[in-house]
C-alpha cells in the first residue's frame, strides 16, 4: 500500500509523519529544535539546524516502516520569520516567528502611516516577526547580512529546497507573511517599496499553488533521508492553513482553532475583504481564503510551565497536567493568567503574569489559570473575527491542547460554541500530506482529499451553560487587567530602550 510523507516544521519541533492514503498514521518521528537567543527578543534557528532536524526526523520515521512506498512528499512550516540563503544557495540566517527584535520597525511603520497602506495591499497587519518587517530591520541594522542574501524563504521552503534542489514558495505563506499583494495576487514593487524593500523583490521565490509539484527528491537528499530518489515534492503550505486542512476545514464558513505555539483562529472565506480589521489573510486554494486572528499566546505557555516547574512526572505536559486541572472547582478567587510569554496580541510590550495568587493556591490552581488564560486569548481573537462579521457557530480544534482530556471542553465552555476535535494529532503534517496527494493526482482538490483522509472525533463537545457563566465574568476581568497593565508594559519597554541607548 502506498504512503504520503508529511513534514511539519514548527518553531519548537520538526515532525515527519507517514500516512496511508486514508489518513491513517503509520509512523511518526520528531526532532526538537534549539532556539538560539543571543540577545533579548532574538529567536534564531540556523538553516542548517532546520535541515538536520528534517533529515533526522525522516530517517527515524522511515525506520519504523522499512517497507513504506512513499509516493509524494509535502512540507508545512511555521509562517513568517525569515530564512535566508546566500547567492550560492548556502545557509545564511534563520529567524523564527517568535522573534521580536523588529518591534521598533513595526511601530515606525504604524506611526508613519505605511502600515495602513501595506494592509490595503497585503491584508496583513505589520508586526515584529513578519518576514518583510524583519527583512527591513536587517537591511538597516545588519547590512552586511542583507547584502549577502540571495534568497529569502519561509520555513517550509527551506525544507522543499533541500529535498528537491529547487527554490520555491507558495501563495499561502506569501499571503500570510505580508509579501503578497492581493490586488495582483502576487508580489508587487509597490508593496515592497512600502516596507523600504524595493531592492529586495528579486530575493523572493517563485510562487506556486500549495499542491503544485515543484521538484523531485535529489540524489543527495535521498542519501541523507532514506527517501527514494525521484519522488515528487510539492510546494508545501503555511502550517496554520495546513492544520485547518488536516482538521477537515476547507469549505467556506468552516472554522478552525489551533492551540499550539500560536493561538490560531481562522475561518474559510470566499474572498478577502479590505474592510475587515483582522490580523491576517492567507490563501487556501485558488478560490478560497483564510481569515485569521492569531498571536503567540497558546499552549506553548504550558510547555514553559511544565519545563520550568517540573513536578517529577513524565509524559506529555497537557496530558499530565489535565488530572490536576480537573480537580479544581469553580471559584471566583482562582488566579488569572496572561499568556504573553512570547509577547502577545498587544504587540511587543505585553508580558505574561499570574494575578490574584494567595498562599492557599496550589500548582493545580495555577495550571487551571494557565489553561483558562490561553483559552481566553483564543476568545479575544474570536471576538475580533465576530466583530469583523466573521461569526461562526462551531469550530474544529487541533494542536497541543487536544492532548488534554479536559482542555477541549474548556474551549467549548469559554467560547460558548460546540467544538469538534480532529482525531489525528498531527494535523499540520496531514495537511501537507494531503497537498502532496492532490499534487500527484490522488484527489482532484483539497476538499476530496479531506473527505478521504480526515477523521473527526464522533463526539461533539457542547458548551456547559454553568461553566460558561463562570468563565464569562473572569474573561471580563482578564481584559480589565490587560488594560490596567498596558501602561506599565509600555513604560518597561521605554525604560529598556533608554538603557540600550
Question: What are these model-derived regions, one by one?
Answer:
Residues 1-95, 120, 148, 222-223, ...:
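N-terminal glycine/serine-rich phosphate-binding loop of ATP-dependent small-molecule kinases
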Residues 202-212, 319-322:
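Short linear loop/turn motifs
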Residues 5-6, 103, 110-122, 133-168, ...:
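Active-site core segments that coordinate phosphate-bearing ligands/cofactors
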Residues 59-97, 125-129, 160-181, 206-211:
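Short beta-strand-loop/turn "lid" adjacent to the catalytic site in phosphate-handling enzymes
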Residues 43-51, 124, 128, 207-211, ...:
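Short acidic-aromatic active-site loops that bind/stabilize oxyanions
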Residues 23, 46, 73, 99, ...:
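Residue-level signal for inorganic ion chemistry
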